[in-house]
Amino acid sequence: MDARAPRPEARFAAGKAGYAGDMADQDFGSTDFGAQDSVADISAVDIADWRLRTFALYANVRKIAAEDPAEAHSYWRQERDRMFGTHPASPLTAAAKSSFGGLKTADYDPIYRFHIPLTNEGAGREMNVETGTDGLVRFVRLGTFDLPELGQLAVWKLNGYGGGIFVPFRDATAGQPGGSYGAGRYLLDTIKGAFHGVQGSGPEAEFVVDFNFAYNPSCAYNEAWACPLAGPSNRLAVEIPVGELY
């Protein structure tokens, strides 16, 4: 869930303090992700193609993961690297693409894959996020994921056109050397296709939650993007050393 072309005062622009707290400026190899290309030059057709490819990517991930989650993770890494490095709607600038060697992603660890129910804790709470492009973005809380030995994460629904389930998070690796992006990562963002499925139905339904597929918001790679980030209800005190790093 990323917005384009934020105004300078956008609360969630990379490098600024906002809802998620201070955002750390980190190096990503020799690539400078701070330089801004004009995102206004990205065509609507290219954006639509990026979205279609992302939905197809996660559909294939779910299919492969039903038999072999680690293989699905390898496929996910390969396809994301290809899209980031070559697609015209990639958040990487032209300069960053020229030296791009792949996203920094940890190897798969099955202990970070869960099948968990959505509890009612916190359900109905509203959260309004001021962005620089879409004005006030409204969320309503659907409930909570209780993650064994890790903590709790609020589960949000975009309360507007398109809907969608949204779960950002920030863990103890955020902003640390060799760790994750200082402002946090995304776990689920169904309006953009990032979803790993639900097993069962009704009260017995369980979400597939796999931190190995956690990924950085686009603003981690380009300051021209603004992104809703992890607030107090979406922070974990423990380290999550898997997924996309920074």
Language model segments and positions:
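Short, positively charged and aromatic/hydrophobic N-terminal segments
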Residues: 9-11, 19
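A compositional/structural signature for long, glycine/proline-rich flexible linkers
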Residues: 21-162, 166-175, 186-191, 202, ...
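Acidic, glycine-rich flexible loop segments
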Residues: 177-213
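Short conserved micro-motifs at the rims of enzyme active sites and ligand-binding pockets
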Residues: 178-179, 219-223
